[in-house]
């Protein structure tokens, strides 16, 4: 996985190379803040990610995931997750989240993710929840 924005973001040339090799692409959104993800509306954050992906030439409607990275110490709002996922999905990408579900460290992500799954179980907004902890690599 590569980042969608920031210092080591993926380039348009890399996107083209990966597409030519029929590779799966997962892009991480690392410029979010706790203030943003703890609000009730993630629509603007999602539109910003979608526009960045389009500018880089990331193809739509081919199963490419845009992962919102949620830091382990952050609080998050499941309504932010729902509106973020809905906007990402409506724009041709797979909504996904990276977060630490180790409830002994921060129960908030685990609880809010559960609310998100329950609230979206009858719609196709759920992409993936990618879990990690600081002592291991991505799983």
Regions inferred by a protein language model and the residue ranges of each:
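Substrate-binding cleft of extracellular glycoside hydrolase catalytic domains
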Residues: 1-84, 89-91
């Amino acid at each position: 996985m590569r980042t969608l924005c920031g210092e080591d973001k993926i380039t348009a040339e890399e996107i083209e190379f990966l597409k030519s090799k029929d590779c799966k692409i997962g892009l991480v959104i690392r410029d979010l803040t706790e203030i943003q993800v703890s609000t009730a509306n993630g629509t603007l954050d999602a539109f910003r990610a979608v526009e960045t992906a389009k500018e880089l030439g990331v193809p739509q409607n081919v199963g490419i995931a845009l992962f919102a990275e949620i830091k382990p110490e952050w609080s998050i709002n499941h309504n932010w997750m729902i509106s973020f996922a809905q906007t990402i999905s409506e724009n041709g990408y797979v909504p996904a989240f990276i977060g630490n579900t180790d409830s002994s460290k921060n129960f908030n992500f685990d609880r809010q993710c559960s609310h998100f799954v329950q609230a979206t179980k009858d719609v196709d907004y759920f992409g993936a929840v990618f879990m990690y902890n600081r002592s291991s690599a991505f799983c």
